C-alpha cells in the first residue's frame, strides 16, 4: 500500500484564549493547528473597575472573538483564560488580586462555561504563559524548566516532570509581596517594601517619573 501524507485539518476545531492584567484584556483565536487567526486587545485600568465589570469586559472580548469566527464558532472546542493574582486552577476559582479589590473567590470557570456552553480552562496567567512558551519554543519536549515573569508582579515558577509546581495552596512562586531590604515604596497591597513595588513594570515607570521630576532624567 502506498504511503499517504496526512495533516491536521485546520478547520477541525477552534480555540479561544483570553488573558487580563492590570492594564489590558487580550483575546485570541486559534485554529486546530494552533495557528493564530484572531488577536485583539482592549486597554483597561482594573483598579478603577469592579469584579463584575471586568468579567463583563472579558465576556465581551470573547463574544467579539466568536463574532470574528462567524459560522466557524460552532466548532469552538474550548476557552482558556489566564488570570492575575492568586487562583485555584483545579476548581477554576480566582481567589484574589491586589489591583482589583472585590476580586474574591470568583468561580470564573463556571461563569464562563454557563455563558458560552463550552469547556473552559482557567489558570494563573503566568502558568498559562509557561505552557505557551514550553510548546511554542521547545515543542513540549522540555520537561523541567524555571520560568521568571516580571510584569505588574513578580513570579518564579518551576516546571518539574511537565507540571508546574503550585504548592499546597497554589501560591508557589508568588514573590511579589515578599518584603525586600531597603524597599520604601507603597505596594498595591497597602504594605511598604514589597518586591512588586521595586521591580515590576509599574514600579520602574514610577521610578522614571520620579527621576524626571527631580531632574535625574530628561523627558
Name these PLM-found stretches:
Residues 195-219:
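A mobile "lid/hinge" subdomain adjacent to the ATP/sugar-phosphate binding pocket shared
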Amino acid at each position: 500500500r502506498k504511503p499517504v501524507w496526512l495533516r491536521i485539518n485546520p478547520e477541525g476545531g477552534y480555540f479561544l484564549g483570553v488573558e487580563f492584567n492590570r492594564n489590558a484584556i487580550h483575546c485570541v483565536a486559534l485554529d486546530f493547528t494552533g495557528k493564530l487567526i484572531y488577536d485583539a486587545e482592549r486597554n483597561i485600568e482594573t483598579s478603577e473597575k469592579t469584579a463584575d465589570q471586568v468579567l463583563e469586559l472579558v465576556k465581551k472580548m470573547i463574544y467579539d472573538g466568536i463574532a470574528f469566527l462567524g459560522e466557524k464558532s460552532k466548532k469552538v472546542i474550548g476557552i482558556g483564560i489566564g488570570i492575575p493574582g492568586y487562583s485555584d486552577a483545579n476548581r477554576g476559582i480566582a481567589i484574589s488580586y491586589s489591583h482589583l479589590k472585590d476580586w474574591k473567590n470568583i468561580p470564573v470557570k463556571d461563569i464562563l462555561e454557563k455563558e458560552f456552553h463550552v469547556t473552559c480552562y482557567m489558570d494563573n496567567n503566568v502558568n498559562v504563559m509557561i505552557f505557551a512558551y514550553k510548546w511554542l519554543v521547545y515543542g513540549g519536549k522540555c520537561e523541567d524548566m524555571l520560568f521568571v515573569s516580571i510584569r505588574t508582579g513578580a513570579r518564579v515558577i518551576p516546571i518539574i516532570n511537565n507540571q508546574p509546581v503550585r504548592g499546597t495552596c497554589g501560591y508557589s512562586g508568588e514573590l511579589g509581596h515578599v518584603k525586600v531590604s531597603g524597599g520604601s515604596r507603597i505596594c498595591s497591597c497597602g504594605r511598604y517594601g514589597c518586591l512588586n513595588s521595586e521591580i515590576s513594570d509599574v514600579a520602574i515607570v514610577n521610578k522614571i517619573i520620579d527621576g524626571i521630576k527631580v531632574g535625574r532624567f530628561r523627558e
